[in-house]
Amino acid sequence: MKQIFKVVAQSDTFHVPSQKAEGGQISKCNIVLQEPGGKYENSYVATILDEQANIRFAKDDLVVAALRFSTREYNGQVYQDIVVNEIFKIKN
């Protein structure tokens, strides 16, 4: 899903262990994205990984983002994960 979103909030970047990363750690942050149109539009809490996690976005920035949705089951509960594949700020 590639779409235009408004940035609602972004967490600080932190590092988590990863066997797939060269240095054994991967950068990660969470971002809240909202579809344009008003305060009651759909919002998504997504994870940004790797180098893109170091890019800072301000509240109300307009961005184009490609999101990947997946689900997983853990202890009988089903969880949805949303990962940002790519994200670009739209210049005003």
Model features per residue range: what roles?
Residues 1-92:
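Single-stranded nucleic acid-binding surfaces, predominantly the OB-fold ssDNA-binding core
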